[in-house]
Amino acid sequence: MVAACLLSSCSDDSEGLDQFYETHAQELDNYALSAGTSTLFNNSSKAFDTDASWLSGTYASRFQTGDRLYDNVTEGYGPVYAGYSCGSCHMNAGRTSPGVWNRIGEDADGTPVYGSGTNGMSAMLVYVARKNGVFFQDYGRVLHDQTIYGVTAEGKLQVRWDYEKGHFPDGEEYELAKPNFTVVKWYKKMWDNVKKDSVSIRPEDLFCTVRIPLRHVGMGQMMAIDRNEIEALAQKGYPEYGISGRCNYITERGVRGVGLSGNKAQHLDLTVELGFSSDMGATNSRYPEEICEGQHQMVEGSMMGLTYDKLDVSTEDMECVDLYLHALGVPARRLGSNSTNVTLTKSDGTTLTMTERQAVKRGEQAFYNAKCHLCHVTTLHTRPRGATLLNGTELPWLGSQTIHPYTDYLLHDMGSEIMGVGLNDNYTSGLARGNEWRTTPLWGVGLQKKVNGHTYFLHDGRARNFTEAILWHGGEGEASKNLFKKMDKADRQALIKFLESL
């Protein structure tokens, strides 16, 4: 019935669609090659976890080593941790189903409670900070809700969801879910290196903000992007739609530059060493101290004969993981216009029907009509020299490429008052304020369900599908959200079909 509606709607507007595709035909066909020579034609659950075709020789060998280290349990992880390997949170280089939707019990009144599990991983990061936005260092930047045997977790996250219904102008209903985060079972016994006594931490002195894993799609291409192009986009702006993105200038390793990596564009590189240390508790040359260094149980551990004097991850191993992330391919856009040579298939491998092709064509036009492309910029370019690994190795194969990540990598105000909270988490990172977020790259987004089995989106997983993700846009995204809401149902469904094609 829906398919019939979509086909009928497309037929009614076929002249407009044909004109749109005639104008943009060559450009749209090229979008299928999402990442130039790093494009993969792979619709399987390994679509994010496959190397680019240019990889060979010793690079291929190091990639395999990095892949193994990424997926397997990290030697020396803990004693407290959030994930036991990169892959525990980024399954198949994607987004493991997050703990914010992991049901762990219910309140006395039967209300479901979600959050930290006891299965050795939580697939989410809980940033802990004082109310002035400064990290509470003794919790090691993030809350470590998992531990090795005999060690106490730093705390457990509980999530309760509030739901609010709304409706589109045509009467169709929707529902948004708003999270309420609470940390319980705090590890309060902290070791004060000066006073040598235990002190209690008052939970009311701290606050938390939650992140679910990002997809590791297009990391190498992101690192190879011409930063001048990003800065030019920041200068552009679209005042008629209230859009004015800006760069997050970051200083890391003594270098100041345009941050691209992370939910708030808060890093200059892929943070391999930080991930091993902060998320897994694995010491390395850049972060040689245990993440729970200030905790009393570190002293207790020494009394029990536990030692922490050896680095857990070698520099060579970290470099292999860095290469692995840079050399992952990017899945092609699977649904093109009728003139493209790209196979028209869905994420499950079945052939796309003509009705669905029309829906995707209509959805792409709707994407442009809603001005989504002003922030989710379709086309960017990589600099001639490509990307540089942590050890200084150049990857020229990533250079001089035309790519289609559907992002500008800029910070945008996403609003503060939707259901009383919006997307403002009151957490600053570099120049990024609490209400500012990096535009999320959309390449590969349509394969997330195939790769990871879920469609949770946004920084904390509150959006359960594409429609909810769009409806949470506020601030600079308000105009696009309202244009989406005003569309007829067929156009809204078509826009979602288009997103599923990326």
Locate each region found by the language model.
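Periplasmic c-type cytochrome electron-transfer domains
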Residues: S11-L502
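Sec-dependent N-terminal signal peptides
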Residues: M1-A4
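C-terminal motif of bacterial Sec signal peptides marking the signal peptidase cleavage site
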Residues: L6-S9
